[in-house]
Curated annotation (Swiss-Prot):
Organism lineage: Eukaryota, Fungi, Dikarya, Ascomycota, Saccharomycotina
Entry's transmembrane regions: none
Disruption phenotype: Still forms preautophagosomal structures (PAS) in proximity to the vacuolar membrane.
Domain free text: The LIR motif is required for the interaction with ATG8 and for the association of ATG1 with autophagosomes.
Organism: Kluyveromyces marxianus (strain DMKU3-1042 / BCC 29191 / NBRC 104275)
More info: Kluyveromyces marxianus proteins are shorter in length and have a more ordered secondary structure than their S.cerevisiae counterparts, which might contribute to the superior thermotolerance and solubility. K.marxianus could be therefore useful as a new model organism for further elucidation of the molecular details of autophagy.
Subunit structure: Homodimer. Dimerization requires the presence of ATG13. Forms a ternary complex with ATG13 and ATG17.
Region Disordered, annotated ranges: 387-425, 458-489, 619-642
Superkingdom per UniProt: Eukaryota
Keywords on record: ATP-binding, Autophagy, Cytoplasm, Kinase, Membrane, Nucleotide-binding, Protein transport, Transferase, Transport
InterPro entries: Atg1-like (IPR045269), ATG1-like_MIT2 (IPR048941), Atg1-like_tMIT (IPR022708), Kinase-like_dom_sf (IPR011009), Prot_kinase_dom (IPR000719), Protein_kinase_ATP_BS (IPR017441), Ser/Thr_kinase_AS (IPR008271)
Protein name: Serine/threonine-protein kinase ATG1
Catalytic function, reaction form: L-seryl-[protein] + ATP = O-phospho-L-seryl-[protein] + ADP + H(+); L-threonyl-[protein] + ATP = O-phospho-L-threonyl-[protein] + ADP + H(+)
Listed EC numbers: 2.7.11.1
């Protein structure tokens, strides 16, 4: 479909409540909003129309963000902030009528410059006047860097006067307008309140969906914004103040100079770790030079400790921010004015200049990067999963001392950065998608989970057991490869279990691990370590027995943990029971997820073993044949079948409808896991903050750390699946989407639980391994209990309107489940009698 015909189709499809505006073509699209170009019938001006469907704002927090954005934009007017002209609402949609910025966002100037100078007359003229400093990177000319820094500073100064913190400063939210539209000389330009050079494109801050009124002394705790540009205190779930915006300004300034962000990583926590490890040293590529006073400013902004970070007054009065740029306005540039008017009259958005045959892409020889949406609220959505397993680039570099200037930046390694003919200079990957997505909203529950786990780690017992490790609050623990038993050969039981320090307990891990291997058809990738001695030793074979006994008692209505008063004596059994349920649900989700994104045979997996928060394994169980051989290396065998499929071929091997179904099922199961994990932390939190002594057992501490890690992992994988579903939905016919059947997580759990119990009964009748049968019955009971337990509903767990009150189980459904629970519990009792 041509751009023109597409625009006409859009105009017919969108109808605003009033007739003050006409809607033309779509210029940006994201998960929550579609941005159209339009025209105001009052004065004929071009406008941007941000259409947000109410149906996509299912989360209360997202609706609040939109309402906040509208409220803020109505109150603030500034030449370097995208203005809200009008707002219209219908029963199904919000329409924000905003200033139109025909040149897109700052990423077009940085990442698409090479393509645009060949196609866009105004941008070509700008870069002819102010050429880039080097062909080796995408950094901008110093004049452009300082000009846009000053305009950004002007907008931030205005926001500070209103006690506003933006919380999502990044190049994608810095829009560029064509210059010389309402003025033609420097005097008029500055009288209108603009800062910088009058004949250059004008920068304006957009997207106030995450902004908040926050005085200088106030602290916030919600994690939001885009991780690549987030301050470390936000990445680490700490409270933060308005100085978080200054960190983001530092990252933008660095990117304008070097053509890429200062830090990159595969997830939030790895990014935080890289920032912390840098120890306030900022490394730049060896092919990039930043003058000392700009580099000093970057270092002041990119200071890890917010207390030591440059303050707003110091920033606003910095010599670079206050530098006089009037000398660049002395000469008249007729080309800029004529080209600017041509662009305005052409009615073309910047991305339309980039549409061209694929054959020309190779001939261009420029940097190939992801297209970005360029208007406020248009989320970047790429289909980059197939690049997921490319080797990750080390962006830290090797620091080298500079002899020219003591304040000049250390030069970093150029590995993976310098270009050669026919090669791209940087590789995009799914990791970048996760980090660059437009909206990151982590509910307050996430902050609470991590905060509580840190409290336990800080205040809990260090160790009372020989060989146990101290539990630390940081979420970056890695497995040790040392063997605490010295030269003693591990026993058969120890060789069967390779259990990380975050497992609930050895006995419980054994039960749950076998359940995941034998019953869910999925074996978790094990760590590359062969030792199990550096974790706390909690060998208590009674735990699993107690858990199964409790399941039987609950089935006989002789026990209901939630009706008991929480105390020091029963808090651990409470949490153990919930951990068991969370693990079977998590394992079910992992089985589905492994079919969508198989684990690669290397450490470059997104869910890397180097990051415990994202590690898949709480335990790893060897195959019986391998175990009996006594070969410890057999632990490193990954799941056969699906996990051997390369990520590059997974989309082709699974038909799109089936892939989408798998994604939806896996997402629902991860969300259910999150609900159970949050429930256990809510319970623990209540006990912890009512406990004056703030003392807990080592076992409970380990459980809490395990729950925290699983919670964060499930959240990350749910985000990945949400984005993948969005990509799949975009590629499908709307008619097909309407015809898709609804998937109920309750039915998934119910069917799986009955399937497990049937297989266990068959195995028992065949005289199979009774231990396996016991595990299967227990797993089935835990899954069915999840369906019946009202305390594990999302409405009960999340107190902030996170979920709806919709449930797919009526009383007759519950009665049927109770009958199965009773039947399976009786089988389990009979089996235990046989075993004893």
């Amino acid at each position: 479909m041509s751009s023109e015909s597409h625009g006409k189709a859009v105009a017919k499809a969108i109808r605003l409540p009033t007739e003050n505006y006409t809607v033309e073509k779509e210029i940006g699209k994201g998960s929550f909003a579609i941005v159209y170009k339009g025209v105001s019938l009052r004065d004929g001006r071009n406008i941007a129309i941000k259409a947000v469907s109410r149906s996509k704002l299912k989360n209360k927090k997202l609706l609040e963000n939109l309402e906040v954005e509208i409220a803020i934009l109505k109150k603030i007017k500034h030449p370097h902030i995208v203005g809200l002209i009008d707002c219209e609402r219908t029963s199904t949609d919000f329409y924000l009528i905003m200033e139109y910025c025909a040149l897109g966002d700052l990423t077009f100037f940085i990442k698409k410059r090479r393509s645009l100078v060949m196609k866009h007359p105004l941008i070509k003229t700008v870069f002819d006047l102010y050429p880039p400093p080097s062909a080796e990177h995408n950094g901008l000319n110093r004049v452009l860097v300082v000009n846009y820094l000053q305009q950004l500073s002007s907008a931030l100064k205005f926001l500070r006067s209103k006690n506003l913190v933006h919380r999502d400063i990044k190049p994608q939210n810095l829009l560029l307008c064509t210059p010389l539209q309402d003025y033609s000389d420097p005097k008029t330009f500055h009288e209108m309140g603009f800062i910088g050079i009058y004949n250059l494109p004008v920068l304006k801050i957009a997207d106030f969906g995450f902004a908040r009124f926050l005085p200088n002394t106030s602290l916030a705790e919600t994690l939001c914004g885009s991780p690549l540009y987030m301050a470390p205190e936000i990445l680490n779930y700490q409270k933060y103040n308005a100085k978080a915006d200054l960190w983001s300004v530092g990252t933008v300034l660095y990117e304008m100079c070097c053509g890429r962000p200062p830090f990159k990583a595969s997830n939030h926590l790895e990014l935080f770790q890289k920032i912390k490890k840098a120890n306030d040293e900022v490394t730049v590529p060896s092919n990039c030079y930043i003058e000392p006073k700009i580099f000093k400013l970057i270092k002041g902004l990119l200071t890890f400790d917010p207390e030591a970070r440059m303050g707003f007054n110091e920033f606003f009065n910095n010599e670079v921010v206050t530098e006089d740029l009037s000398r660049y306005e002395a000469s008249y540039e007729p080309d800029l004015e004529s080209k600017s008017k041509d662009v305005a009259e052409s009615n073309m958005f910047v991305s339309e200049y980039l549409v061209r045959p694929a054959a020309q892409e190779k001939a261009n020889g420029g940097l190939r990067t992801d297209e970005g949406s360029a208007m406020p609220g248009a989320e970047h959505t790429y289909n980059k999963e197939r690049e997921h397993y490319r080797e990750r680039q080390d962006l830290q570099g090797q620091q080298q001392q500079q002899q020219q200037h003591p304040d000049s930046p250390p030069r970093g390694s150029t590995q993976g950065y310098q270009s050669s003919a026919g090669q791209t200079r940087m590789k995009s990957s799914y990791n970048d998608l996760i980090l660059e997505k437009e909206y990151v909203v982590v509910e307050k529950k996430t902050v609470e989970v991590n905060s509580l786990a840190d409290d336990f780690a800080n205040n809990g017992p260090t160790t009372n057991n020989q060989g146990a490790q101290i539990i630390k609050p940081l979420r970056y623990r890695t497995s040790s490869s040392s063997d605490g038993h010295g030269g003693r050969r591990a026993s058969l039981v120890e060789r069967r279990l390779s259990i990380s320090s975050l497992s609930p307990s050895n006995a419980l891990s054994k039960a749950l691990g076998l359940a995941s291997v034998r019953l869910f058809g999925y074996q978790q990738p094990n760590t590359q370590t062969t030792s199990t001695s550096t974790h706390p030793t909690l060998l208590n074979p009674q735990i699993f027995h107690e858990l199964t006994e409790n399941a039987v008692l609950r089935a006989d209505h002789h026990l209901n943990l939630f009706n008991e008063q929480i105390s020091d004596s029963n808090i651990t059994p409470f949490v153990e029971s919930l951990s068991a349920k969370a693990f079977v649900m998590y394992s079910f989700a992992e089985m589905k997820f492994s079919q969508i994104l198989p684990s690669p045979p290397s450490s470059t997996d997104y869910y890397s073993q180097s990051d415990k928060r994202l590690s898949n394994g709480s335990c790893a169980i060897d195959d019986d044949d391998d175990l009996d051989s006594g070969n410890p290396s057999s632990n490193q065998t990954l799941t056969p079948g699906a996990n051997k499929v390369s990520a590059a071929n997974v989309d082709n091997l699974i038909p799109a409808p089936e892939l989408k179904k798998l994604c939806m099922e896996s997402l629902l199961l991860y969300l259910k896991s999150l609900t159970i994990l949050a429930s256990s932390m809510k319970l623990t939190s209540k006990w912890w903050y009512e406990n004056e002594s703030k003392n807990c057992t080592l076992k409970l501490n380990i459980l809490v750390q395990w729950i925290r890690d699983r919670f964060n992992e499930c959240l990350d994988k749910a985000e990945f699946l949400r984005l993948k579903l969005h990509t799949l939905n975009q590629s499908e016919d709307p008619q097909v989407l309407d015809d898709e059947p609804t998937i109920f997580v309750e039915k998934l759990i119910y069917d799986r639980a009955l399937d497990i119990s049937r297989n266990a009964a068959r195995l028992e009748m065949e005289g199979g391994n009774y231990n396996t049968c016991e595990l299967a019955y227990a797993t089935s009971l835990w899954m069915l209990e999840i369906l019946l337990d009202e305390h594990l509903s999302s409405n009960e767990v999340y107190d902030d309107g996170y979920s709806s009150n919709i449930t797919s189980l009526d009383e007759s459904d519950k009665e049927m489940i109770r009958k199965y629970v009773s039947s399976i519990a009786n089988r389990l009792k009979a089996l235990k009698s046989k075993m004893s």
